[in-house]
Design a protein with these regions (language model features):
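Conserved N-terminal entry element of GNAT/NAT acetyltransferase domains
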Residues: 1-34, 38, 171-191
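Active-site rim helix/loop that mediates acceptor-substrate recognition in acyltransferases
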Residues: 36-82, 86, 210-238
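Conserved beta-strand in the GNAT
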Residues: 75-79, 85-94, 104, 109, ...
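Conserved acetyl-CoA-binding loop-helix of GNAT-fold acetyltransferases
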Residues: 107-110, 116-129, 133, 138, ...
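Conserved beta-strand-loop-alpha-helix junction that forms the acyl-donor binding cleft
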Residues: 111, 141-150, 168-172, 306-317
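Conserved active-site alpha-helix within GNAT-family acetyltransferase domains
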Residues: 121, 145-163, 311-328
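Conserved GNAT acetyl-CoA-binding A-motif
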Residues: 131-142, 299-311
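Conserved catalytic-core motifs of GNAT/GCN5-like acyltransferases
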Residues: 142, 160-173, 325-335
Length: 335
């Protein structure tokens, strides 16, 4: 894919400067809220609250000033400032992937009164230059699929789409109706581990493992892993959907692995993911996923909102049938 080289030297764009966490966190939070509040969820609101709270925490600011390049927090980046007001931002978040440095560009925002001037483009390129100067092996970003302007901008800068994933959410509900079915839901048996592992690796691929919180190894059955989860207070629940006629016929699995926060993550894997494209929504796999999602909504009735990350366009009807609603679809792009 072609890449457009844009001038981004400090003397050509004097409005651009590096993020100063000692004074910029609150105005950047205000800018992000202004630009993204219509699509912001509770986690996003909490993120902004944390930024504003951190901006008044001297101990945190002192620590963060020395850790900006080694922590997965948005403590590095570039802003566009005019008349002592921040009107543009691009954050840089460092990650490690198998020992290699990568960066996620996030929070690319331009004040509505200053758009169509190329500010977002220039800030994104400056962020890319920073990442390359740090010997990053990859630069990532994600963008909503309903933002064609931003998608084109990033494509013009050399980013290519790697994945497209939808986040689904539903509140636990003990009263949610459970339809009659020939599918049985049980705790996941160790004999299903090999099949579950294969499905999970296909559904949660390695190229996004640096960002996804799923620790697949923690799901492995056995005494050692059980002791690890016990001593680390690592709470996990796993279920399997099988045919009542043949209990050895695994149809789907579902894992609940809360990470803290206002939503709790669940991870689904179904047989359909390994079938040809034209057969992916097979009846048994789709019905099994629906039954598992209904089961977890009923079983975790006193828990926070459940959140499912799933490939966009896959099993849509099955997930909707369980009462989940799509929150957003993100396109993951890499340069």
């Amino acid at each position: 894919m072609s890449s457009i080289t844009l001038p981004a030297k400090a003397n050509e764009h004097p409005q651009v400067r590096t993020l100063n966490i000692l004074r910029d966190l609150s105005p950047v939070a205000d800018l992000i809220e202004l630009c993204f509040s219509p699509t912001m969820d509770q986690d996003g609101q909490r993120y902004l609250s944390d930024m504003r709270r951190a901006s008044h925490d001297d101990k945190f600011l002192s620590w963060a000033n020395h850790m900006a390049e080694s922590t997965s927090l948005p403590l590095t980046g570039y802003v566009w400032e005019e008349n002592n007001k921040i009107v543009g931002n691009a954050s840089l978040i460092p990650f490690r992937d198998q020992g290699k440095r990568i960066y996620l560009i996030a929070n690319v925002a331009t004040h509505p009164d200053h758009r169509r001037r190329g500010i977002g483009r220039i800030l994104t390129q400056r962020a890319m230059e920073h990442a390359r100067s740090k010997k990053a092996t990859a630069i990532w970003l994600h963008v909503r699929d309903d933002n064609p302007g931003a998608i084109k901008l990033y494509a013009d800068l050399g980013f290519q789409e790697i994945a497209r994933r939808t986040n689904w959410q539903a509140n636990p509900d003990l009263s949610f109706p459970k339809p009659a079915t020939d599918i049985e839901i049980n705790l996941r048996h160790p004999r299903f581990w090999a099949q579950q592992l294969d499905w999970l690796r296909r559904l949660y691929p390695d190229n996004l493992s640096w960002y996804q919180p799923l620790n697949i190894n923690a799901l492995k059955p056995g005494l050692i892993n059980w002791l690890y989860r016990l001593f680390m207070d690592f709470n996990i629940k796993q279920w399997a959907a099988v045919s009542k006629r043949d209990g050895e016929n695994l149809l789907a699995t579902l894992t609940w692995m809360p990470q803290g926060g206002r939503t709790e993550a669940i991870y689904a894997a179904t047989r359909s993911l390994v079938l040809p494209k034209e057969s992916r929504d097979d009846v048994s796999g789709a019905e099994a996923l629906t039954q598992l999602l209904i089961h977890v909504r009923r079983a975790l009735a006193n828990h926070p909102t459940l959140s499912l990350d799933y490939p966009a366009g896959e099993m849509t009807d099955a997930i909707l049938a369980a009462g989940f609603k799509p929150r957003r679809t993100l396109i993951w792009m890499r340069a």
